[in-house]
């Protein structure tokens, strides 16, 4: 059976080569496409550029082909934007035209073919989902309702680290404890739930399934079936694994969190009032018929993917940079002690009084952007950009990392220097008021989680610096900050071992 399938596929490839050659010649006369390497039939530029189109590799192509270039990845168009002006055009000026999301066979499995919010196309469904998610997740009221919980979780990290005898001597992988903190931060918001320890069986299952989902979705293993549709039958085994992981995740979300919350709601007396968690609002929308149960579960899916690990990576990067720059760490600690007083723990209302802490957060997001190419955009229909034709359903990547690290736009961008946000970049904020710096995107499809991420980053980094001297492990002058990823997400290659010496405040 496999030999027959292979024979048919080879014949299809041959026919497709002829068709692609003819079509490309015909289309070439009509379209003015962005510059880029010369594609070959069927494979496009895939064999030339490979799979790993991370933020740094795309900079090399931008230097060769310009701020707007096109890569043909098999049968898919990939358009890369590398300048502030073009970024404004894609994200804001033509935000409707380029406001959709690309999907593929793997993302279709994990999102139920766009039943979520983050990865759905721009249109009525997205507007409805965004509206329903905004009130329970992305308002200042949510911040005020949950800030004490975030502060409690940060304090719990401090307490647990102090109890660990290795933390002040040979060092610990702080990320492990911070991961539990981030899950608790978000599950408090969603379900008014938290996990007691890193060994909690449900936490371990959840973390493992989320990790497997990310690995499968971000893998290059399925590119051949995505780029060349006639080879898609060979992905059956891979897609079966994806479907199994998706089914187990959705079942876990439903049984242990959504259904449990429904039972709690049903046991309350009619008309009783109380502080609602996010899922209560989402379930009310389901009861009104605005969304269905699948939409509810995919909202939970989105939060697990988009809100937890991204903030965790940024915290990890920020702490690593402070370890490697003790003078900046000392300056930040001095601000905290001076403004708040020695031993007075930073809280969310204090953050506006701590400009250097805010600058450290902004500099971390600039140099070590968690999603360096943002979440990809797509134009549903043929479009124009900078005088070039952009064919319908092109994948649009904004190299946001390069916008914030281009030496033509930033002074010594390779340096971790928070002072830049007091000096030459004093006007720049993380909300995208300057298109050289858009860590959360801009416009309709910007990340609404900015309202949660910034205070959590400030509270967590602030408390770690207040309570500990952060040092590299014995025998090392710095921690390794080699990068891993960059096409989807950017994280540290090897999780840092940090020596955390308690301060006597």
Curated annotation (Swiss-Prot):
Protein location: Membrane
Q: Pfam families of this UniProt entry?
A: p450 (PF00067)
The residue stretches assigned to a coiled coil in this entry are: none
Highest taxon of the lineage: Eukaryota
**Any one GO cellular component localisation term in the record:** plant-type vacuole
Q: Which family does it belong to?
A: Belongs to the cytochrome P450 family.
Query: This chain belongs to which protein, by name?
Result: Trans-cinnamate 4-monooxygenase
Organism field: Arabidopsis thaliana (Mouse-ear cress)
